[in-house]
């Protein structure tokens, strides 16, 4: 592909992205981003309109054309096999995409649909697909017990927020004989945006952001709603995501990132050993653990000691890496680690560059 053609595709990709996210400023932003004239931007817009990717809605107003919009509720009893659902219902609606994007969609759909079949106790599942020239979005909704409620009851946890903390660690399943507990974790990392709404909890992950977001919603959502969205021309691959959470020469899911703030409730401080033990549950299943201290302003001595001295001494085979810690948290971690750091060779990167 020649350089002018690459640049033209980059410009049109930028226009498509901004038409979807903020159409009112697409022309000005494109001019600034690529240092081109207004006339040049309009030329690229006309190209996209001619391709059928954009619709002209009036003076200076454009929107992405829907290439596919499909919504269907199906019986789980009549459709128990995720690969058959993919082949007969989903792949024809998603249509032509690069192989790497199709592989991501296959993984996401089959993992999430299988979770509905095996765990939700729902009789039906609704699937919605919306595809434009730029992105494809899929929503999978069931009407069962709810994913966070299921985890809370199966593991005897405090509440649904505690269930979210466990889910974000990975390797979590309520059926260890039939599942690895990796599906939701890896699916959430593969897509541009991924969210789960269930009960009173909204969990969201965006690809280029390390941390997960969790919100308390006012109205209780029955069952579970899952949304997955991906750019059609993504360069991402499933292998790339799997490799990101594999430590060194190891094979398998051996590395995880734990958002420490999910162990907090409201404005409480992380000060106690019981809070630390809650954070450390199932961490011994990994070989490398990154504790992300984003939005954690301070931690107590007992909390730090339990994580960075007691647990570290008991599990010398696990590499513990705190990231994105502020000065106060860093100092407390250093105090807890004093005397054991040289012996265990634990890594420490408060800025998250490891």
List the predicted regions and their residue ranges.
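A short acidic, amphipathic alpha-helical/loop segment
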Residues: 186, 278, 306-307
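A short acidic (Asp/Glu
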Residues: 206-207, 300-305, 331-333
């Amino acid at each position: 592909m020649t350089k002018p053609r690459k640049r033209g595709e980059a410009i049109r990709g930028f226009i498509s992205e901004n038409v979807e996210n903020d159409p009112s400023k697409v022309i000005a932003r494109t001019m600034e981003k690529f240092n081109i004239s207004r006339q040049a931007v309009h030329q690229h817009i006309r190209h996209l309109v001619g391709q059928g990717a954009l619709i002209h809605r009036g003076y200076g107003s454009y929107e992405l054309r829907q290439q596919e919009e499909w919504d269907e509720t199906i019986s789980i009893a009549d459709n128990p096999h995720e690969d058959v659902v993919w082949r007969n219902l989903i792949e024809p609606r998603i249509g032509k995409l690069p192989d790497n994007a199709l592989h991501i969609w296959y993984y996401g759909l089959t993992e999430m649909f299988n979770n509905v079949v095996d765990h939700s106790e729902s009789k039906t599942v609704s699937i919605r697909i919306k595809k434009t020239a730029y992105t494809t979005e899929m929503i999978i909704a069931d009407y069962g017990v709810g994913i966070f409620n299921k985890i809370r009851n199966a593991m005897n946890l405090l509440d649904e927020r505690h269930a979210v903390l466990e889910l974000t660690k990975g390797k979590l399943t309520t059926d260890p004989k039939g599942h690895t507990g990796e599906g939701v974790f890896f699916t959430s990392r593969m897509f541009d945006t991924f969210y789960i709404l269930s009960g009173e909890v909204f969990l969201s992950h965006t690809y280029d952001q390390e941390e997960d977001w969790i919100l308390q919603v006012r109205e209780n959502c029955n069952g579970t709603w899952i949304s997955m969205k991906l750019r059609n021309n993504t360069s991402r691959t499933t292998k790339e995501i799997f490799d990101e959470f594999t430590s060194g020469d190891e094979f398998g899911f051996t590395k995880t990132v734990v958002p420490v703030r999910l162990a907090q409730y409201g404005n409480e401080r992380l000060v106690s050993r019981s809070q630390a033990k809650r954070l450390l549950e199932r961490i011994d299943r990994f070989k490398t653990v990154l504790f992300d201290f984003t939005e954690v302003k301070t931690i107590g001595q007992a909390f730090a000691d339990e994580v960075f001295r007691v647990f570290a001494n008991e599990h010398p085979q696990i590499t513990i890496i705190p990231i994105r810690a502020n000065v106060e948290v860093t100092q407390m971690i250093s105090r807890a680690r004093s005397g054991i750091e040289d012996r265990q060779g634990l890594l420490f990167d408060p800025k998250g560059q490891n």
